[in-house]
Amino acid sequence: VDAQGKPLTPGLFAGISHIGLEEISQEDSSVDANLNLKTGDTGLIETLRPEFDVTRAYNPRSTLLAVARVGGMSFTALGTDGALLSGQGGVIRLDGGYEPIAGKRVPFISIGAGKLGQSGSSRAAQFMLLEQAFNEAKAPTPGDERLLTGQGRNALNQAMASQRFLVSVNREADIRQVLKLAQKYAIRVALVGALACLA
């Protein structure tokens, strides 16, 4: 970059955030980061919605963008964490544009205690449901009970083809299971949180 003698300030990454997806976190009508379907809305397991694309609700006119830019932040990864397989996010420049960088989406998986209510109160069930979803997306069996919608299968197939997933996980035993899952399905995972790795 030739700045012709002018000072340059590097932009910082704001991490995985809800900037532009929520204004006031305690005001439900201003929070678009998570899909909160009520049980029975569709008859499908509500914790597995890989087709939910949180970038579609991104508001580049949010007042929080200006605050982030003043703090030196120039881009962020929009994330969703409302469910076990909670949907997709993407990296966004905080420059007022609407589209994720390169148009790419990254799926989010959330494992652990915070999702026990959505998975029969068992971490083992979380991994069971994820494996069933991956298998169903690869080769759905006619007449088999469906965990995913048709769009969900397509979204998960595309995600598996791109091989990138962000996984929110903290407990060491859960991290080990995530790595086994990644190896089994030949996907790459980036761990979010991973608090057990800090010990």
Residue ranges of model-derived segments:
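Short gly/pro/ser/thr-enriched loop/turn and capping motifs at secondary-structure boundaries
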Residues: I19-G20, A83-S86, L198
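Feature captures the catalytic cores and cofactor-binding loops of soluble hydro-lyases/lyases
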Residues: E23, A186, A199
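Short, glycine/acidic-rich beta->alpha junctions
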Residues: R56-P60, A196
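Polyanionic/metal-chelating signatures
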Residues: P60-V189
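Short beta->alpha linker loops
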Residues: N170, L195-A196
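Catalytic core of soluble alpha/beta enzymes
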Residues: R176, A196-A199
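Short internal beta-strands
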Residues: A190-A194
